[in-house]
Amino acid sequence: MKSFLTKWSFSLLLLVGMASAAMSQKTISGVITDATNGEALIGANVLVKGTDTGTITDIDGSYSLQASEGDVLVISYAGYTDQMVTVGTSSTINVALEAGKLLDEIVVVGYGTQKAKEVTSAVVSVGREKFNQGPISDPVQLLQGKVSGLQVYNRGGDPNRASVIRLRGISTVGANVEPLIVIDGIIGASLQNVDPNDIEKMDVLKDGSAAAIYGSRGSSGVIIITTKKGSKKTGSINLSYNGQVGASSILNTIDIMSADEFKAAGGTNLGKSTEWMNEVTRTGLSQVHGLAADGGFGNSSFRISANVRNTEGILKTSGFDQFNARLNFNTKALNDKLTIDFATSVTTRDQNFAFQEALRYAILYNPTAPVLGTESPFPFNSTQFGGYFESLGLFDAFNPVSIINQNKNTGKRTEFNYGANLGYSLLDNLTLNLRIAQQDNTGASRQYYPTTSHFRGNATSPLRKGRAEFYNDNNKFKLYEAYATHLSEFGQSTLSLTGGYSYQQSNFISNYLNIGDFPNNDIDFINRIETSQDLQNAGFIGVNSDASPDEKIIAFFGRANLTVNDAIFVNASLRREGSTKLGEGNQWGLFPSFGVGVDINKYAKISALDVLKLRVGYGVTGSLPTQNGLSRAIRGIVNGPDGSVTTNLVRAANPDLKWEEKGETNIGLEVAAGKFNATLELYNRDIKDFILERVVDVAIFGVNRRIENAGKLNTKGVELALNYDLVKQSDVSYTTGVVLSTYKTVLDEYVLPAEVRGNLGAPGQNGTNMIRVKVGEEIGQIWGPVFDGVTDKGDVKFKDVNGDGKLVAGADKALEADADFEVLGNGIPDFELGWTNNLNIKGWNINAFFRGAFGHSLVNTWRAFYEPRLSTQTSYNFVNTTLAVPGLTTARYSSLYVEKADFFKLDNLTISRNIPLNSKAIRNLNVSLTGQNLFVLTKYTGADPEPALVYYGATDNGGVEGNTPDVLAPGIDSRNNYFSARTVTLGINFNF
C-alpha cells in the first residue's frame, strides 16, 4: 500500500504542477441541430479534440463547456457526419450536422488508414463517443456489443483474470486464439498496459483479407487501439481527473445443503453450523484514480496520464494494486515534412491470487465442522494445523478458511513499452515511415505453504513439511519496420501503394525454485530465501530454468488500394513471412489477400438509401503457437537426490512442422437510411495443418509429447449489426443497437478418426472424458451415456442406445465410449446477441447493455461429483439442486449432468449526468452510477451459464498439460472456477 500511495502522490504532483502553464479558458455554448429540418439533436457529443473535455447536448440541443481560442471542437451524433470547428473569439458556436454520410469515416488498418467507404473487408471502427459508458477497467469492454462476431467472456469474477476475447469463434487450435492487440502501432501490446480513459478509438479487423497484412500474429483478427494525443494549440494545457469507487458481491454460487439438511440426510455431525462461503468471501472494494494532462507548444503536442487501481476480489485476500503511466509526444519539423510520434508506457501490477480452491472446499466441506481446532467436538491438536480444524483421513477435504489465511499466493508483473514512428514526406505523394518498438515484460510469482498447512504444506507428513515456490520470467520483444506509401491520381481514379519490411525478435527466460521440508517456519514467505544457508535449511530443493534462443519473424509486405469513380474499390496485399520457430525448408510462408467493394447506390441511386455497399474479400494468414522452439526438441533439467543435475527429453523435435494456414472468404453488405444502418457479414474459413501438441509413441520419438500439424477445420458464420435512432423529441432521445452472430466449426481432417477429450478427474472419475472430437462433426460435442434411472441399490442405470442388451461399464469401472454413448449437447452457442440502449431524458443519460447466448450446454461437474448421496461420503456436503435424483448414491457421469445453459443478462447499466460548471477550479463535471451483472435469466443450475470455451483439464486432457487451455474441449463447467461478482460503481470525471 505504501508504494501504491507513493506512485499516486508522484502522479498527482507531476500533473498538477503542469497547471501553472495553463492558459485562460472561457465558456463556449451553442446549439446542435439537424441541417435538413433544423430540429435539435439531443445527446450529441461535443468534445475538445485531443483532450478529455467533453459534454453532450440537452433536450434543446444546447451544450456548454470550457475551451480556449484555437481549440478544435469535434461534434458527433449517431447517423450524422462529424464536424470539427475551431474556437475563435466568439463564445457561441452553433453547428448543423448533415445526416447519413457514414462512409466518410476514417478507419485505421494495417500500416495506414482508409476511408470507410474504401474498405473491402470486415472492419469495424468504434470512436470514443460510441464506447460503452460507465467505469470500465478492461479496455475490450468498451467494445462489448458494438462489434458483431466479437465475443468477450468473463467467466467468474477473478480480478486477476483477464476477459476471454474471441473474434469469430475458433480461429486456431494450438496457436494464439485471441486477436492481436496493436496499440499506437506497437504490435502485441497488452490490454492491461492501457487505461480505458486513454483510448481515443478502436478498430477491429475481423476477416482474413483485413488481417493478412499483419501476417501470423494477426491470424485470429486484430484490434487496433489509438490512444489520445495532446492538443496542438501552443501554450495550452488541459488537466482532467477520473475516479471510481466500487463494491462487488458474489452473484451466484452452488446450491448446497444447510447444516440441518446435511444432518437430516445422514451427514456426520460435528456440532457446529458454519456458512463456509460467508467465511471465505467478502464485499470486494475497488478504487481508481486517474490524472491526465495534455497540451502543445510550437509544432509539438503531448499527453501524459497516470492512474492507480486497487481492486479487492470477492474471495478474501484476492485482488491487485496496479499503476499505469503513459506518455504520447508528437512533433513536426523540416517545414512539416518530418513527423515524429513517440509513445511510452509502464505498468506495474502487484497481485494476490489467493486460492480459488477455497471456494470449492467452501461448497463441499462439512457444514457442521468448526473453523478453529479449539472448537472440535473431539480431542484435536490444533497447534499442528495453525489453530484450524482439519478433517483428517479424508481425500480432498481441507478447511477453506485455513487455505486462504495460512498460505500465500502472490505475483508481480512489470511491463514497459516504447515505440517511435518517423514519417517523412519525400515528395507530395510519397511518404517514408520508420517504426521502432520494444516491450519488456517481467513477472514473478511466489507461493508459500507453512509447516502447519494441511492444504499443501503436508502438516501430517513427517517427510515433507512446508513448501515454497518461486518463479521468475522475462519476455522481451523488439520490432523494426520500414515502409513507404505512394499515392497517385489519374482521372476519376486513385491508387495507393504501400511496401515495406518488418523484423520482429523475441526471447524468453524463466527460473523456478521449489523447496520444502522446513525445520520450522523461519524460512517464510517474507524472507524470500535470501542466502545459501536458507536453502541448506530446507530438506529438499528443486531448481529449473528455461531460456529460449532469439526467435525471429522477418517479413516483406505490400498493399495496393485502387478507387475508381469513388464507387469501385479494390484492395490487395501480399506478405511473405519467415519464422525461426520452424525448421529449414518450412520457415517461409506466403499470405495474400484480395477484396472488392462497390457503392451500389452510386449507380442505382435509390433515394431512400444513403448507403448501399457490397464487398467481397479473401485472405490467407499463417499462424504459429506463441511458445518458442516449436520444431526443436525440448529438454528439461533433472535434479538428482545426490545433488547431480542432468537433463531429459521433454518434447520431441518435429523438423517437418510447417505453417498453420487460414483462408477466409467474407461477403459484406452495408445499408444506411437516415437514422438506420445495418451491416451483414457472411464468412467461410478453412484452417489447414492446424498445430497441436499431442501424445505420441514413446518407442518412436523417445518421449510422449510432440508438436504436429494435426488436421483441418472449417468454420461458417453469419453476423448482423443493426443500429437505429428510434426516438428524437424535444425532451427525450433513444438510440438502440443489436449485434447478432452465429458460427459452427467442423473438424474436416484429424490425425485420429476420433478421440474423447476433457477429463472429469478425481475422485473416482479419472477415466471419464466428456468431449468428442471426430472427423465430420462439430467442435464441442458433449459425449456420454444417457441416464435412464436408478437401480434398487442406488446405482445409476444407463440407456441401452443400440438395443443390444449390453450395458456400458459397471458402476465400479470407468466409463468407456461405445455404441451406447450419444451426443448430449454442444458447448458452443448456436447464436449470441448484444443489445445496446442509450436513452437521454432531460439531461440524464441511461446506457444499458444486455447480452445473451443460446443453444449451448455445459457439463455441470459440481453436480456430477457432489450431488449423488454417497453413503461412504457422509463427511462431505452435497450439492442440492432441483435436478437431484432421489435415491442415487453413486457418482457416474451421464446426461443427467449436462444442462442447457441459455442465458440473457443485463451486463452493464450506467446512469450519468453532465453537470456544467463555470468554476475556475472544476468544470465539465460528469457523475455516473454503474451496475454490472445486475441480473441473469437462465435455467442452468451452476454458478455461471457463460460458455466455457476452453478446458484446463484434470490429468488426462488429450495429452495437454493441466494449465494449458484445450480449445477442442469446450462445454465443461470446472469445479475450480472463481464465482462471478455483481459490482456497483460510482464514477466521477471532471476537468480543471
Residue spans for each PLM region:
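Short, small/polar-rich motifs associated with maturation and membrane association
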Residues: 1-333, 338-347, 355, 417-418, ...
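Membrane-spanning beta-strand positions in outer-membrane beta-barrel proteins
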Residues: 72, 118, 151, 236-240, ...
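Extended, hydrophobic alpha-helical segments in both membrane/secreted and soluble proteins
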Residues: 199, 325-327, 554-560, 568-576, ...
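Residues on the lipid-exposed face of transmembrane beta-strands in outer-membrane beta-barrel proteins
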Residues: 227, 258, 291-295, 325-331, ...
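Surface-exposed loop/interface segments of Gram-negative outer-membrane beta-barrel transport/assembly proteins
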Residues: 232-273, 314-315, 328-415, 433-554, ...
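Transmembrane beta-strand segments that form the barrel wall of outer-membrane beta-barrel proteins
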Residues: 243, 306-312, 570-582, 616-618
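Short secondary-structure subsegments characteristic of cysteine-rich extracellular domains
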Residues: 320-332, 587-595, 925-936
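C-terminal substrate/ligand-recognition segments
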Residues: 830-855, 897-916
